[in-house]
Structure formats: C-alpha cells, structure tokens
C-alpha cells in the first residue's frame, strides 16, 4: 500500500462515465480483488450519504427555465415569417416543413442546453438535477420534457408533425398538445410489450448462427490483419472509440516507432500499451480479429483476444459464439422500436456554418458560383470548386475559403454584420447517411381553374397520363371561380366563354321543383305590367323576382322568358342574326315535347353554308320494328344536288338524305334476326310459323309469317314476312309483277273471293324452286306528310331585324332511300323522317364570299329574368376587322363580332344594382377528370378585384404612325379581358370596374324611333406586340403601355427596405401577394391581370403554389380542381441515419440484410462496381477471386459499423468482437458463378469461402464465385449440421432434404449434441470426440498455399485490407 502516497487527491463531481473509467483503471493497476473491495466501500458510502441527505422528489422541484418564453416567441416569429413566405408562393410545402422542424428542433435543443446550466447555477442540489445528471435515473431528454418543452412528435406513420408541443409536463398540456402526445405515448406502450418478444427472437436467431463457434486453438497461423489508425484520412476517430477498439486485441504485426520495435506480433494489448501508441502517434496498427481467423467452424485464442471477464487471453473451450449472440441480443430490450428523437430527420448530413468575424463587405468571384435554392427554399449560391470569400472592413481584410458543394448565403458586395452566417458547408465526403425517397402530396385548398407557367413540361410522363413533370422551379396557380357540373343536363345551352347569371345556374342544378313561385306567377307579373310605361322608363322593376329564375325542368334549351322582351335588345344591322328561344307556354300550345328540338352547334361554333342548324324528330314518324321504305312513286323523289348535300354530324357515317317531294311514303314491316354463322336454327327456309315460335335456342318470333333464311359472310340473316300467301293462276296478272304497291280499290280479279282493298298492300313474288312460285301479299303502313312546322312558332321573329340576311329553310328529310331496309340496334326506335332547319344567307350581298359564320350562345338578363339567344355573326374573321369610315357605328378597334350586342340600363339608377352585378359571371367550360360530364367554371366579379387608379402613372413614347385608309389591326384573343370572351367582353361582369363614355345611337325600329343608350369601353387593349391600341378610329396615335413601379418588400430581422424596379404590366401576367404596384401600399392579394385600363388594373384572384424540379403535377392545363384534389407530388430525400428507423428494427434489418435496408442499395452498387473494374483489369479467374475477397471485406466493415452506430446512439456499449463473430458467419458463404465451370460445385451452389479456397488449391484450378450476404435466418438454415437447422425452423422440410441428399451430421456444434443428449464440445468437454489433423498434414496445406497463392503474401495483404473505415463510426 506504499503506492497510496503517490495518488493525487481529486475534488470534483463524478458521474457514471467517470466511474466506469475509474473502475477500468483500478482493474489495470490493482487487479480484480482489490478493485471489488474499493467499490464495496464506495457503495457503502453512497448509501450512508443518501440516507443522511434524505433527498425526495416533489413537483416543486421541477423548475421551468426562465429563458423559455423569449426562445419560444422567437421560434414562433420565425414560423410566422415562414408561413407568410409559403402563402406568397416563395417556398413550397416540403421546404416549409423542413424549415419549421429545424426551427423548433433548434429551439428545443437550445432549451435542453440551458436547462443544465440553469440548474447548475441556480440550484445545484436540485433533486431532479442530481438524479438525472448523475446517471442514477432518467436522462436529459426526459427531464427536458418535464421542465423544458416536449418539442416535436411523430404521427403514427412516423412522419413529423410540424406543430410542436410548446408546453412541458410541469405546465400542463393543452387539448391539442395532449392528443398529439398520445401518438408517442401509445407507441411507447406498444413498444414495451413488443420489445421483449422481438429481442428474445433476435437473440435466438443470433445464437443459432454462431452456437458452434468455440475457441479450439491457440493460434491459427494467419498472416492477415486489419489496420486501425486514430488519424483517419476522412475524419478523426475519437480517442475513446480508438481505446475501446484496441484494448484486449492481439497484434498481427510488429509495431515500430522509428527503428525501435515497441510491440511484437501476437502480443495482446493493454491500456498502457494503447496509451503509448496514442502518445507516440503511431500511424496504423495491424490487429487480429475474428475476421482474420482461418476457420469458420471455430476460432483461435489469438484472433479472439482477451476474455472480457478476467482480462486475460480467452481460455480454450470457451463458447464465444453463444456469448456473442447473447451480448448483442440482450441489450435489445433496452433499445426502442422507433425513436422519438427528431434531430436531423430532414437534414441530409451535418452542415457547418461559416460566420463573419466582424462587420464588412463581402467580395467573391461571381463566375465561380451559380444560383440555387437551399433545402429550406432560401436563395443561395452553389460553388463547385474552392471559393475564396473576402470580407473587407475599414482596416482589415479577412479571407475565407469555402470548400466545394457548399452554399454561399450572401450576395456579392453585400454588407454583413459580425457573427452573421455567410456560408453553409455541406459534408462532401461519402458517409453512411443513407437517404430514402419520400413522397409528399400537396392538396388544393380552394376550387378553381389550374394554370401552369410556361416552365411546366406539357408532355406527360406516361401516355394517357395526367402526371406532368416539372423541369425547373415554377409556380402553379389555382385561378378563382366557382364550379358546377352539368351532368344532369342532356344538352347544355351554355358554352365556353358565355356570360351567365349565377343564381340561375345554381337553382337549376340543385332543386328546381322546390321553388315556391312557379312560372305562371312570373308570367302573370310580367304581363300585368304596363307596357306603355316600359317605353318611357326603359325596364320595369322586377327586383323582387330575382330569385325566381329558370324553368321547372333540367333542360337548358328553353327558358321561361317571353319574346315580348325583344324590344329590350338592340343590335347592329346586317352583321348578326339573333334567334330567341321560344317560351314554355308557346311550346305547350303547339304540343311540342320539351326535348323535341335539338340544336346542333359545332364545337368551334363555325357554320358552313347549307349546314343543318337544328332538327326535330317527330314521334309520329318513329318505328320500333325493321322494314323496307318505299316512296309513293319512283319519279316523285329526287336526290339533292351534290353542292347542296347536307352533312349530318349526328352519326359517324354520313347518310345521304333524300328531299321529299311527295305527300306520303310507305313502310313495309318485317322481323329481322341477324345470327352468327354457327347458330342452330330450328325452322326451315320458306316455312310458315306462328307467333312466339322458337327460332333458335333463345330467340322466339314476335310475329307469324313466312320464314326466309339468307346465308351471308360469317352470319345468317333470318327474316319473317307477315301477310297472306296467294297461289296465283297462270292468268293472274298481279303475279307477274314482283315488288309493287297496290292502292286501295283494286281487288283480286281471279280469286274466288272478290272484294275491294281498304288499305295499300305490297305484293312480292317468292320462288322457292325454279318451277314453283307463289305471291306474298304484305301489309303496308302509310305515312302522310303533314305541313311543315311553322318557323315562327319555333323561333319568334326578331323585332329588330330589318332584313333577313340569314335564312332558315325548313326541310323534311327521309333518312332512308327508296327500297332500302331500315335496321335498328336492339330495342332502339328508328326515325324515318327528320325535320331539319338549314342555315343559309344571302347570295347577293357583299358577304356572299363568306363560306363560314360563327355562332355562340348569349344570355341576356333583365332584372332577374333571363333570355337565351343564339347569335350568328356574319363577320369574315373573328381576328381582324376592316374599319369603315363611312359608318362610325360600325368602326372602331373592336370588331362588331367582338362587341357586346346587348345592354340595358335603368335610367333611374344609371348603373345596375350592386347585388345584381355580383350575380353575373363568365362561363369557362372544362372536361371533368372522369370525362363523363362537362364542368362549368363561373368567373364572377366577386372573384376579381381592382387596383388603382394610379395617379402617378406617366405615359412614355407617344409614337405617331401613319395608318392607311382601311388598315387591318390584328387582335388576339388574349388582348381583351383575359378569361372572358371578347365577343361579349363587357356583359355585366366588370361593370363596376370599367369606365365608360356614353354615346347616343338612334336605332330605327319597326314600332317607333327610340333612343338607346350604349356604353363604349374607354379602356385600352394591348396587342401581342405590347402596344396599346387607341380605340378612336380617327386618330393616328398609338401609345406604349404605361410603366408601373414595383416595390418588393424584404423582411429582415433588423430593418425593412424597399427595392424599386420598373416593369410593364401586360395581360395574363401573374402577381404574387406582397408585391407593391402602387407607391402607397403592397397589394394584398395574388392573381392574374385580367383587364388593363388607362389608370387601373383588374386582377383575378389566384392562389400560387411553388413547385421545384422533379415534382409531379397532377391534372391538365385549365382543368377544374376542387378543394382537396391532389395538386402536386413532391419527391424529396430524407436522411436515413439512425433517426427514422431506430433500435431493434434497424439492427434486425442490418443482420437480416433485407432489401429495404440501405446496405443493399448503396453497398451493392459499390460492390458491383468493384467487381467489374477488377475483373476487367485482372481477367476472369483472378478478378473473381480478388473481387469476392474485397467484397467480403467491404461488407463486413459496413455491417459492423452500422450495428455499432445503432447501439452507440442508444448509449449501449458492445465490444466489436461480438459483432464481428456474427458478421463473419453471415458473410462466410460464396455463390458459385457460371463463368468458370468446375467439376466439383454446381453454379448457384452456396459454399463456404474457405472451402472454396481449399478446393481450388487441391484441384490446382481457380473456382469462380461471387460474394453473397446471407441474413441470420438464412445463415441458420445453411450450416453443416442438419440437426441444428431442423431444430430452428422448417423441421420437416430440412429433414426431408437431408434424407434425400444423404447428409451426414458430424455433431461438431453445441446444439446438435444437446438435441441428441451427448457431451457438448465446449468447456471441459471440448476436445472429446474431435478429430485433429496431424501437423504434417497442416504443413502440406500451408506449403501448397504458398506455392499457388503467393500473390496473397507481402504487399497483397495491404491491398485487401487497406480500408481504414473499419472502426470509423460516429457515436
């Protein structure tokens, strides 16, 4: 005990880690017995002092950290700014989530650090502080939840919830925080139950793999070793891990410091020797590990090293395999199934920040960087090579070198303050921080129309797909508008770009029958008004009828408005044709069914000359049965001339139509069945059958009569003719003519019965054989053609039309030719005659060259009453219009086709009431996703807002241009109000938004001369060249668009500043929120420019969504999206370090080498690359051998590192050698490949690595094989003992296979001896029954190895084991 005087007295706090270190040093110095005596004394001292102190734990001991308030407030402020940026469209959802989580994680971690300092300064003897920080019970994370803040939690799917729990358990949780906490709490409860069973099963599998590993030799004689260096080329290995790695190992080589040998081969390492290596800074130390041992079925003492129990070399007969399996499996109960630790979840590796040392100006070479976005969506510069950044102060110039692939967060010439972050250094070296790809779906939070920027790739990823990829960062916009589906409507009158009344539409689409006021009351109210007053005051007041709109059924074609309203309309002469629709009352008088008239308008709205405009199918000319059509006399019908041929678009094949010149036609009915060629017909040809006779197995006849069977290509046509059969005499004249119609009055002359015919009959001669014939007299249905439907009853006359430029001609068409058979599809009826309205216009006037006219629907609303019109415009083109100086009313910038033809104004109010104005909008028509129904999007003035007037706007560059006498000015569709049709651009929607000049135009009406007030737009239209076109037709001035100043509001932590830019506002341009257009204030909404006026802008509300490259956009351009529809899918990478999958599942993934684990993703790629390169350099046999060897070394290193990383992250210490024994077993097999066929092994066979090498040496030929990673389960089922395999899993299969193969079990392992009740070959019985090969035999093998594989001597060992990452794992 004389050494006691030399010991130094320490007076400082000692925690659990320091006690462990102290015990380790005591064992090294004084041995086990003396150390245990000292520890007993420490234990007694501890109990005595704890009793005397009488520490208790109460709720008052939980002290909240004072700085928590402002820390949380600061984080909330940052989150608020982030939310604003997301709303403005500056960052997308994934960037917002990432940044939000990192803000709160940083706050939580800072609070955790403050907690320890706070306790230490204010109350060092606080029981909570002493309990947790001494390591007695509880850890920093648990105490942090008690007195700090609970922080971020994960949801049941393992994703982070970006709403943090700001309270701690001492303060108490709010209801929301409590529910969020329950996710983690429930997971914890389930964890505890499942963890024990999982850990037990893991232990069983581990022991199964290595139960036969016993120490059976002192030295295996290996020459291999693995190098460990404290100063790694990638990063410094921590001293503690370096010491843990080396202590208890055996050296594989002599260690030299200079020329002096300080340690010998096969010497075991203690703490003193390791400290000497650290002191002298030895570069690399080669040690022996279980990996280097030359046998897979046992291990030698030197390769295993010291026993952890007594500190000496392991004894012979020690069952180190079972110890290793239990050492790894037992701490499994301490591991969590899923961690709740959230650090670095969304970060891809650690990032270091470079801060400015003092205030100054930044200078760097801008050519060496290029702009990018950080993972938080902040603008930054990415540098590809080393970049020198200079910070210039008044008297100091400081230079910083930024490594490649780092982000520069400041601009050139920017002033930075001291400690401001100027760069973020990303870790450029390869680490095992594997990434996983995660999908994040963004859903629309409003309904409207989808709009892409030009940056979206319009070609979908797959054919017939609506997923579009994004090549670069851009915005997606959801333009506002309320949508309705029109699936209930058979034929919708509303077309794209029409103006409509919104309540009218909504009432129709919901429940019209529930209206309390019916159409009779509307008409009564209308007709009871004084019509003489109407001419004076303009329009009677029907404001109380605003809610009564539309008709009582769903057909949009008809509307309960009366053509007496026509005098409320005005129109320009000779260039339009208006067709008002008939009211319901008039239809009921004419007994026309509601769905009778179908108006056919082409998709593009273009009519050609003589095209069918509408048709009416009279139900009187409808038949359900098949038959033959006959005209009265063949001379009476004539086919329409070729140039007047009508194209009927209702059917796919154009049928020729015949214009009827006669008053009647005949229909001869017959029953027709078209049967497949293989049908079994149960009746004979030319036989007579009755009604309901079975023709085939499942077809019965509907009429009786004569059967006629005709066999055609691949089908049989069976006809049944009803009628009388007549066998005529030779003198009968009728029988000589076949296929004639006989009118009433003529009788059968030679028949015994003589009577006059009452109806028409059809006589048909039928000849079954050459000699025999008879006549079939068939009944005929006669159809008289009624007078044509009066056009005026269908379409009331337009009061304003002076001259009919456009004519509607009524034609009756027979849809089938003379003698042609009519065929129906299943039970559908056959229409024989169709009444068509053919559109034509004057051939004489100047517009006779027009072959096409445009048409569209117009809806006119008068104080809640609505009238629908079809407007057909005789204008040469909708793009250009020739000005006429002679007619000022027809001249102007906008063509007559583009002007709004209808406008009615009440002289009392001047402008319509605001409520009515907001109830009108423009229809945008879309196809729905299911393609079954069309959707309408209604854009009303409530979806728009106005900015202006801009009083400070200056007009620049007034250019005088000489305009020819009749110039053609091109106006594109986008030049008018965007999103509304130019044809009817100002119809109610934007009345409050536009400024008008009122001019009087005198119109001559049939009734009286009245003055009508028209309003002409005084706003400017911009053409495609960006010029503003002057609406005054007589002036030659063309203005440039005015320029507005933009102010971008930059929010900084220290100050706000404005940056002024100048731009041209053009139609269709998008604005994000918080962009200053006027000097006074930023405008508060985002949207798209709809109308540009002289001093103001009309903007349609829109919501921006930012999307970054690689995102997938769902839906098509201009498709209607509803609230909750998937808008974008982001695919982003998330770190797969020990944070998402943690604890037992992680260890299990690694040990089972599952495909979902990142080992197979990253390691396999590296292994394949290595094998290819080596095979190419060295050729096939050597390439495979060395490639397999390197592969095995690589995979072993990776597996050990990954398993240790998981355990260390949970604070569990396991010695490397235990993991190495397990990993050695799961990497000890190789797969025989097909490249080099051998006579011993089959391709695809699993054999041991050492077995393959020995066989190759014995045969003196190389066996080609590849390395394979087996999981622990698969390795357990691929051992040398079938008894061990059968007792693990799949007993019947394993035993049956072993019996078929005739396998022999040599009972070398522990388990098989236990099963059979023998002595286990471990401990005292390890050398019983074991066969030892002679020393001479061993020498022969070694000599052969030296002869054939001399390549593995000397320097080759360094090639195979040069990896210095083996023990290089982060804590």
Curated annotation (Swiss-Prot):
Entry-linked SUPFAM superfamilies: beta and beta-prime subunits of DNA dependent RNA-polymerase
Top-level taxonomic group: Eukaryota
Cofactor: record remark: Binds 1 Zn(2+) ion per subunit.
Binding site for Zn(2+): 220, 293, 300, 303
Similarity field: Belongs to the RNA polymerase beta' chain family. RpoC2 subfamily.
InterPro entries linked: DNA-dir_RpoC2_beta_pp (IPR012756), RNA_pol_beta''_euk (IPR050254), RNA_pol_Rpb1_3_sf (IPR042102), RNA_pol_Rpb1_4 (IPR007083), RNA_pol_Rpb1_5 (IPR007081), Rpb1_funnel_sf (IPR038120)
Gene3D superfamilies with a match to the protein in the record: 1.10.132.30, 1.10.150.390, 1.10.1790.20, RNA polymerase Rpb1, domain 3
GO MF entries: DNA binding; DNA-directed RNA polymerase activity; zinc ion binding
GO biological process: DNA-templated transcription
Quaternary structure and partners: In plastids the minimal PEP RNA polymerase catalytic core is composed of four subunits: alpha, beta, beta', and beta''. When a (nuclear-encoded) sigma factor is associated with the core the holoenzyme is formed, which can initiate transcription.
Subcellular location: Plastid, Chloroplast
EC number: 2.7.7.6
Catalytic activity: RNA(n) + a ribonucleoside 5'-triphosphate = RNA(n+1) + diphosphate
Record bears the keyword Ribosomal protein: no
Function: DNA-dependent RNA polymerase catalyzes the transcription of DNA into RNA using the four ribonucleoside triphosphates as substrates.
Cofactor(s) demanded: Zn(2+)
Name of the protein this chain belongs to: DNA-directed RNA polymerase subunit beta''
UniProt KW keywords: Chloroplast, DNA-directed RNA polymerase, Metal-binding, Nucleotidyltransferase, Plastid, Transcription, Transferase, Zinc
Gene Ontology, cellular component aspect: chloroplast; DNA-directed RNA polymerase complex; mitochondrion
Location, primary (coarse class): plastid
């Amino acid at each position: 005990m004389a050494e006691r005087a030399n010991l130094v007295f320490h007076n400082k706090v000692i925690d659990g880690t320091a006690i462990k270190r102290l015990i380790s040093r005591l064992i090294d110095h004084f041995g086990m017995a003396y150390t245990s005596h000292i520890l007993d004394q420490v234990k007694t001292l501890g109990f005595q002092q704890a009793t005397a102190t009488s520490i208790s734990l109460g709720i008052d001991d939980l002290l909240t950290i004072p700085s928590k308030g402002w820390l949380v407030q600061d984080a909330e402020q940052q989150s608020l700014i982030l939310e604003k940026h997301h709303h403005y469209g500056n960052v997308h959802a994934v960037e917002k989530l990432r940044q939000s989580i990192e803000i709160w994680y940083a706050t939580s971690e800072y609070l955790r650090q403050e907690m320890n300092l706070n306790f230490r300064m204010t109350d060092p003897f606080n029981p909570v502080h002493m309990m947790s920080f001494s390591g007695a019970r509880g850890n920093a994370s648990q105490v942090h939840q008690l007195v700090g803040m609970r922080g971020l939690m994960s949801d049941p799917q393992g994703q982070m919830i970006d709403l943090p729990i700001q309270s701690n358990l001492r303060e108490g949780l709010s209801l929301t925080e409590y529910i969020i906490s329950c996710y983690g709490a429930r997971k914890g409860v389930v964890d505890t139950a499942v963890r024990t069973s999982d850990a037990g099963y893991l232990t069983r599998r581990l022991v199964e793999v290595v139960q036969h590993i016993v120490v059976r030799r002192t030295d295996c004689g290996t020459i291999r070793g693995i190098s460990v260096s404290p100063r790694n080329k990638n990063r410094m290995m921590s001293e503690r891990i370096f010491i843990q790695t080396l202590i208890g190992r055996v050296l594989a080589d002599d260690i030299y410091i200079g020329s002096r040998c300080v340690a010998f081969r096969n010497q075991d390492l203690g703490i003193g020797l390791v400290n000497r290596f650290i002191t002298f800074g030895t570069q690399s130390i080669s040690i022996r590990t279980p990996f280097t041992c030359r046998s897979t079925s046992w291990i030698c003492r030197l390769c295993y090293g010291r026993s952890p129990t007594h500190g000496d070399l392991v004894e012979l007969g020690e069952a180190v395999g079972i110890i290793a399996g239990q050492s790894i499996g037992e701490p499994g109960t301490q591991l969590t199934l899923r961690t709740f630790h959230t650090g670095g979840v969304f970060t891809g590796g650690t990032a270091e920040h470079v801060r400015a040392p003092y205030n100054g100006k930044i200078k760097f070479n801008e050519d060496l960087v290029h702009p990018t976005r950080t993972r938080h969506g902040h603008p930054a510069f990415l540098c590809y090579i080393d970049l020198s950044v200079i910070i210039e102060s008044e008297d100091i110039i400081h230079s910083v070198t930024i490594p490649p692939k780092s982000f520069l967060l400041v601009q050139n010439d920017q002033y930075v303050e001291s400690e401001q972050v100027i760069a973020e250094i990303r870790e450029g070296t390869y680490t095992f921080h594997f990434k996983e790809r995660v999908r994040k779906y963004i859903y629309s939070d409003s309904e409207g129309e989808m709009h892409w920027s030009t940056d979206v790739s319009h070609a979908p990823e797959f054919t017939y797909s609506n997923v579009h990829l994004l090549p670069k960062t851009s915005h997606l916009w959801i333009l506002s508008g309320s949508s309705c589906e029109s699936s209930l409507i058979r034929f919708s009158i509303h077309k794209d770009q029409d103006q409509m009344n919104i309540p009218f539409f909504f009432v129709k689409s919901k429940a019209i029958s529930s209206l309390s006021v019916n159409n009779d009351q509307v008409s009564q109210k209308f007709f009871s008004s004084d019509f003489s007053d109407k001419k004076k005051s303009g329009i009677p007041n029907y404001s109380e009828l605003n809610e009564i709109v539309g008709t009582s059924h769903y057909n949009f074609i008809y509307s309960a408005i009366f053509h007496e309203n026509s005098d409320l309309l005005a129109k320009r002469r000779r260039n339009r044709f208006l067709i008002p629709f008939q009211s319901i009352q008039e239809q009921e008088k004419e007994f026309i069914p509601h769905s009778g008239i179908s108006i056919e308008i082409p998709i593009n709205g273009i009519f050609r000359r003589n095209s069918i405009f509408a048709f009416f199918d009279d139900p009187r000319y409808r038949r359900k049965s098949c038959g033959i059509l006959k005209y009265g006399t063949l001379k009476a019908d004539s086919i329409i001339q070729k140039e007047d041929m009508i194209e009927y678009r209702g059917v796919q094949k154009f049928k020729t139509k015949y214009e009827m010149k006669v008053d009647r036609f005949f229909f001869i009915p017959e029953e027709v069945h078209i049967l497949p060629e293989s049908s079994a017909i149960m009746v004979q040809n030319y036989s007579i059958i009755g009604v309901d006779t079975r023709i085939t197995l499942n077809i019965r006849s509907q009429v009786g009569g004569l059967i006629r069977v005709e066999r055609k290509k691949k089908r049989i046509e069976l006809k049944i003719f009803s009628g009388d059969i007549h066998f005529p005499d030779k003198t009968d004249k009728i029988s000589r003519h076949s296929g004639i119609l006989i009118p009433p009055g003529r009788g059968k002359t030679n028949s015994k019965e003589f009577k006059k015919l009452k109806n028409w009959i059809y006589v048909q001669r039928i000849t079954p054989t050459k000699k025999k014939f008879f006549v079939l007299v068939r009944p005929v249905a006669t159809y008289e053609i009624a007078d044509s439907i009066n056009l005026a009853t269908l379409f009331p006359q337009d009061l304003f039309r002076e001259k009919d430029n456009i004519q509607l001609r009524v034609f009756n068409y027979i849809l089938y030719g003379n003698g042609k058979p009519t065929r129906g599809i299943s039970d559908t009826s056959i229409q024989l005659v169709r009444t068509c309205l053919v559109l034509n216009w004057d051939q004489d006037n100047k517009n006779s060259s027009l072959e096409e006219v445009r048409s569209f629907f117009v809806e006119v609303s008068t104080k809640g009453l609505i009238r629908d019109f079809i407007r057909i415009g005789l204008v040469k083109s909708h793009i250009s219009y020739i000005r006429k100086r002679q007619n000022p009313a027809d001249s102007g910038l906008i063509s007559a086709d583009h002007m709004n033809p209808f406008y009615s104004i009440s002289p009392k109010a001047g402008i319509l009431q605001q409520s009515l104005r907001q109830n009108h909008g423009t229809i945008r028509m879309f196809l729905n996703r299911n393609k079954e129904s069309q959707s309408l999007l209604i854009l009303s003035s409530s979806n728009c807002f106005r900015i202006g007037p801009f009083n400070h706007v200056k007009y620049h560059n007034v250019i005088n241009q000489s305009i020819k006498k009749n110039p053609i000015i091109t106006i594109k569709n986008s030049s008018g109000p965007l999103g509304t049709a130019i044809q009817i651009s100002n119809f109610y929607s934007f009345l409050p938004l536009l400024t008008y000049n009122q001019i009087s135009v005198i119109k001559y009406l049939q009734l009286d001369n009245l003055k009508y007030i028209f309003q002409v737009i005084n706003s400017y239209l911009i053409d495609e060249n960006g010029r503003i076109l002057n609406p005054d037709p007589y002036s030659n001035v063309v203005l440039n668009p005015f320029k507005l100043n933009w102010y971008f509001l930059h929010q900084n932590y220290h100050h706000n500043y404005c940056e002024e830019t100048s731009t041209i506002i053009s139609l269709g341009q998008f604005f994000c929120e918080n962009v200053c257009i006027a000097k006074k204030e930023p405008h508060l909404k985002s949207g798209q420019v709809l109308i540009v006026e002289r001093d103001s802008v009309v903007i349609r509300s829109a919501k921006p969504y930012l999307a970054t490259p690689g995102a997938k956009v769902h839906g098509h351009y201009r498709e209607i999206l509803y609230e909750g529809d998937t808008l974008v899918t982001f695919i982003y990478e998330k770190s797969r370090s020990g944070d998402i999958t943690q604890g037992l599942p992680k260890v299990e993934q690694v040990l089972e080498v599952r495909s979902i684990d990142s080992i197979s993703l990253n390691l396999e790629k590296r292994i394949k690359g290595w094998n290819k390169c080596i095979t190419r350099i060295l050729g096939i046999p050597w390439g495979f051998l060395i490639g397999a060897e390197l592969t095995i070394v690589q995979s072993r290193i990776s597996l050990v590192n990954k398993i240790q990383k998981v355990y260390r992250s949970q604070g569990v210490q396991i010695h490397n050698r235990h993991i190495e024994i397990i990993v050695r077993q799961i990497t000890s097999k190789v797969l025989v490949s097909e490249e080099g066929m051998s006579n011993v092994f089959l391709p695809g066979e699993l054999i041991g690595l050492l077995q393959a090498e020995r066989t190759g040496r014995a045969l003196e030929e190389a066996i080609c094989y590849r390395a394979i990673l087996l999981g622990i389960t698969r390795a357990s089922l691929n051992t040398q003992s079938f008894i061990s395999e059968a007792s693990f899993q799949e007993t019947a299969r394993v035993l049956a296979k072993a019996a078929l193969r005739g396998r022999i079990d040599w009972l070398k392992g522990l388990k098989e001896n236990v099963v059979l009740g023998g002595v286990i070959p471990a401990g005292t019985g390890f050398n019983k029954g074991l066969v030892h090969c002679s020393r001479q035999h061993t020498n022969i093998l070694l000599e052969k190895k030296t002869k054939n594989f001399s390549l593995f001597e000397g320097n080759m060992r360094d090639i195979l084991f040069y990896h210095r990452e083996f023990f290089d794992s982060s804590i």
